[in-house]
């Protein structure tokens, strides 16, 4: 997966979040979970599962004639690499520009400011 670009759609994130939460999930399990929150057809959800499988984000194993899907990527890794891709595209790789943009535009609480200071002090 290291040579992949980690391009993943918002809809694919929904599927990945369920797989990370459950560790192993059949297509029907994934469909049930998503349909509790979204009005997506089973066919749409199966298409998303197939895309993630073809992209190499998930794999499957047969368990009593039913495929159980599981993640091939750690949640923290894909979040990091997706964020890094975003920073490279939007901020030309300048992480400090990203942070500065958010700090200037967001109303941060004292707790959030203190948390940021603690994180930076650890570096």
From Swiss-Prot:
Residues 74-123 are annotated as: Important for dimerization. The keyword Protein biosynthesis does not apply. The record marks 101-102 as: Cleavage. Its main location: cytoplasm. It comes from Staphylococcus aureus (strain N315). Belongs to the BlaI transcriptional regulatory family. Residues 7-71 bind DNA. Pfam families: Penicillinase_R. This is Methicillin resistance regulatory protein MecI. Keywords: Antibiotic resistance, Cytoplasm, DNA-binding, Repressor, Transcription, Transcription regulation. GO terms for biological process: negative regulation of DNA-templated transcription; response to antibiotic.
